[in-house]
Swiss-Prot record:
<dbReference type="Pfam" id="PF00330">
    <property type="entry name" value="Aconitase"/>
</dbReference>
<keyword id="KW-0479">Metal-binding</keyword>
<comment type="subunit">
    <text>Heterodimer of LeuC and LeuD.</text>
</comment>
<keyword id="KW-0100">Branched-chain amino acid biosynthesis</keyword>
<feature type="binding site">
    <location>
        <position position="347"/>
    </location>
    <ligand>
        <name>[4Fe-4S] cluster</name>
    </ligand>
</feature>
<dbReference type="GO" id="GO:0003861">
    <property type="term" value="F:3-isopropylmalate dehydratase activity"/>
</dbReference>
<comment type="pathway">
    <text>Amino-acid biosynthesis; L-leucine biosynthesis; L-leucine from 3-methyl-2-oxobutanoate: step 2/4.</text>
</comment>
<keyword id="KW-0456">Lyase</keyword>
<keyword id="KW-0028">Amino-acid biosynthesis</keyword>
<keyword id="KW-0411">Iron-sulfur</keyword>
<dbReference type="InterPro" id="IPR050067">
    <property type="entry name" value="IPM_dehydratase_rel_enz"/>
</dbReference>
<dbReference type="InterPro" id="IPR033941">
    <property type="entry name" value="IPMI_cat"/>
</dbReference>
<dbReference type="InterPro" id="IPR004430">
    <property type="entry name" value="3-IsopropMal_deHydase_lsu"/>
</dbReference>
<comment type="function">
    <text>Catalyzes the isomerization between 2-isopropylmalate and 3-isopropylmalate, via the formation of 2-isopropylmaleate.</text>
</comment>
<keyword id="KW-0408">Iron</keyword>
<dbReference type="GO" id="GO:0051539">
    <property type="term" value="F:4 iron, 4 sulfur cluster binding"/>
</dbReference>
<dbReference type="InterPro" id="IPR018136">
    <property type="entry name" value="Aconitase_4Fe-4S_BS"/>
</dbReference>
Length: 471
């Protein structure tokens, strides 16, 4: 009887050859590219007179540098315009499909690919972007890669990699009202650490994971990388199949039935052997907010910022840096901390269900005076669906700005930036020093609903209080 994990099965199916030194040459089923990490890779191909090996397995979009206030070309930033022009030229020269602005398909790469049905169970997926682990929500093994590896995949449709260990993260129970997938993954990273997953793939499993929607699973897998894991995944199940059926790139008819039969065999075997297992109880997780300069520096909304002597010795120096940079004091509450900017979007939380969750909090309320709040849909499809529901009008009536799709303030490679020492409540995935554009800007990570609550109150607020009040 087989005792393999999904990771083992997908790895074995894509193994081309074992290499000296313990690495494996692995076939890449889908290669996603964008404007930031691909130009140098294409230039390297041209220098060697090489062409793209499998253009039909390569899909491009533009996301990082896109201004979200206006998509009109040329962009006001000449560097951004040059980067997009270069991507367009490279895709044209190598016959690669580009989901460009106005195509109806453009969006953040990790939002665009799943909603189009490009991401499928059992695939190996690579992209020159840290949060490629998002696609693991479908039972794929997805890796973020560097520019030199982007070059290698373009040239050979393969990667040299060492096999990871697998840690199962088992989550019992069910998330309570006002607690979301973002809270769950911040809770996991808080307890396992930002380096706890180094050398591992994370398999997310258990009753609480089973109950999550596909978009919630994407949030979980998206941030596996923030816990040090190279990838994260969820076993495909009926929730997965229901989400995929009818998507543009999903097979139909007999091909769908055949795919479905194969996908059902991919899940980790009942007696699969894991290298490690950690258990959590979803019922004990509360709305969670980061207070420091790593995603692991997080606490429940009802907790106090930890004192340095309560932390592991290895975490104490980073905590001291965080207190100083964030201008926060150990032993104080994060609830009530004033906010300057509220950002809802990103590849972590820029999907339709994220906007719907925030909209429920915003309905019949208004952004607090002096707060800059904006919503950035993760893709053109998300924007269209949200606008069909009237969410754009709801947010704008409440004092939010409704923007065009793009990565926006997640990483500030575009005009959306913090200024000075502003504090943002952000639904993105990283709170590093200077991450959102200002060298002194401060980022608090939280769920979209918590960001909405912060926008309404003007400070970090327990979203459950607003839920209990009703709209």
């Amino acid at each position: 009887m087989s005792s393999k994990t999904l990771y083992d099965k997908v790895w074995d199916l894509h193994r081309i050859a074992d290499l000296p030194g313990g690495a494996t040459q692995l076939f890449v089923g889908l290669h996603l590219i964008h404007e930031v990490t691909s130009p140098q890779a294409f230039a390297a191909l041209e220098e060697k007179g090489l062409s793209v090996n499998c253009p039909d397995r390569t899909i491009a979009t533009v996301d990082h540098i896109v201004p979200t206030t206006n998509h009109q070309r040329p962009f006001s930033d000449p560097l951004a315009e040059e980067m997009l022009h270069t991507l367009e030229k490279n895709c044209s020269n190598h016959h690669i499909k580009l989901f460009g602005i106005g195509s109806g398909n453009q969006g953040i790469v990790h939002v665009m690919a799943p909603e189009s049905g490009l991401t499928q169970p059992g695939m190996t997926i690579a992209c020159g972007d840290s949060h490629t682990s998002t696609h693991g929500a479908f039972g794929a093994i997805a890796f973020g890669i560097g520019t030199s590896q982007v070059r290698d995949v373009l040239a050979t449709q393969s990667l040299a990699m060492k096999k990871l260990k697998v840690r199962r993260i088992w989550v019992d129970g069910q998330l309570t009202n006002g607690v979301f997938a973002k809270d769950l993954i911040l809770h996991v990273i808080r307890h396992l650490g930002v380096k706890g997953g180094v050398g591992y793939a994370y398999e997310f499993a258990g009753p609480a994971i089973k109950k999550l929607s596909m978009e919630e699973r994407m949030t979980i897998c998206n941030m596996a990388i923030e816990g040090g894991a190279r990838c994260g995944y969820v076993n495909p199940d009926q929730t997965t199949f229901d989400y995929l059926e009818g998507k543009p790139y999903i097979p139909t008819g007999q091909e769908w039935e055949s795919a479905l039969q194969w996908w059902k065999e991919l899940a980790s075997d009942q007696n699969a052997i894991f290298d490690d297992e950690v258990k959590f109880d979803a019922c004990k997780i509360s709305p969670t907010v980061t207070w420091g300069i790593t995603p692991g520096q997080a606490i429940g909304i009802d907790e106090l910022i930890p004192k340095v002597d309560s932390l592991e010795t290895s975490d104490q120096q980073t905590a001291r840096e965080a207190y100083l940079y964030m201008n926060l004091h150990p032993g104080s509450s994060i609830e009530g901390l004033g906010i300057d900017v509220c950002f809802i979007g990103s590849c972590t939380n820029g999907r339709l269900s994220d906007l719907q969750a925030a909209a429920k909090i915003v309905k019949n309320r208004h952004v607090a005076k002096g707060i800059k709040a904006f919503v950035v849909p993760g893709s053109e499809k998300v924007a269209k669906a949200a606008e069909a529901e009237g969410l754009d009008v709801l947010f704008q009536n409440a004092g939010f700005e409704w923007r065009k799709p793009g990565c926006s303030m997640c990483l500030a490679m575009n005009p959306d930036r913090l200024e000075g020492n502003q504090i943002s409540a952000s639904s993105s995935n990283r709170n590093f020093k200077g991450r959102q554009g200002s060298a002194r800007g401060r980022t608090l990570l939280m769920s979209p609903a918590m960001v909405a609550a912060a926008a309404i109150s003007g400070s970090v607020t327990d979203v459950r209080n607003l839920i209990n009040q009703g709209p």
